Amino acid sequence: MKPTTISLLQKYKQEKKRFATITAYDYSFAKLFADEGLNVMLVGDSLGMTVQGHDSTLPVTVADIAYHTAAVRRGAPNCLLLADLPFMAYATPEQAFENAATVMRAGANMVKIEGGEWLVETVQMLTERAVPVCGHLGLTPQSVNIFGGYKVQGRGDEAGDQLLSDALALEAAGAQLLVLECVPVELAKRITEALAIPVIGIGAGNVTDGQILVMHDAFGITGGHIPKFAKNFLAETGDIRAAVRQYMAEVESGVYPGEEHSFH
């Protein structure tokens, strides 16, 4: 099988072909996802909550991300693999480059970082040094203490305009992908249409180019709060492989996420 690349996702955007992505943290699930054709994965700092049992993503380290990235890469050698740079791993461009190099050596194809225009210099530096970047705007979980909880972002004209400005700035700096989390559908549509790069949504309606879910949410094995945007595909199929196929099919057809999973 040919490796999945960012160029393929750019082609999907141009063709208006929706695509599914998912978080992965280990060899076995990564192999299962790849076997079913789900070939874009993220080693997210969400592992702090889903795997390590913390109440936020903040305790996750670069070493944690690198460890899980290597495991996922062994399970899915041809996937397009994104890896989060965790909290305080990119406070300066130089620090970002050093830590990005660590997760890239572990097997990542691209690093994901949370934040807006303040990251422009960092995105430029990484891109110039052959480290592809995925931006992340909206509800950025590493900023939970600033937001005062996990809340929808970008409501109102001023907040929406700022997120659009941030998105355009990240794209101009060289970001090749963007994750939009927990924003109103109307804003997600504006941003997706304004950018040439693919936009992946989570809690952003079905108007983005792609979707991502934390795998534990997709299979209904979360220990606590279930996000509004989550759907338990395993409950409907009773089989993990069938659940993966249904998730992909519903994303590609625009059935998921539905109105009940979206914000306004």
UniProtKB/Swiss-Prot annotation:
User: What taxonomic classification does the UniProt entry list for its organism?
Assistant: Bacteria, Pseudomonadati, Pseudomonadota, Gammaproteobacteria, Enterobacterales
Oligomeric form and interacting partners: Homodecamer; pentamer of dimers.
> What SUPFAM superfamilies does this protein's entry cite?
Phosphoenolpyruvate/pyruvate domain
pH dependence remark: Optimum pH is 7.0-7.6. Stable from pH 5.0 to 10.0. Rapidly inactivated below pH 4.5.
Cite the Pfam families for this sequence.
Answer: Pantoate_transf (PF02548)
Cite the EC number.
2.1.2.11
**Protein name (Swiss-Prot/TrEMBL):** 3-methyl-2-oxobutanoate hydroxymethyltransferase
Binding residue positions for 3-methyl-2-oxobutanoate: 45-46, 84, 112
For this UniProt record, the keywords arranged alphabetically read as follows: Cytoplasm, Magnesium, Metal-binding, Pantothenate biosynthesis, Transferase
Q: Please indicate if the UniProt record lists Metal-binding as a keyword.
A: yes
Question: Which residues participate directly in catalysis?
Answer: 181
- Which gene codes for it? panB
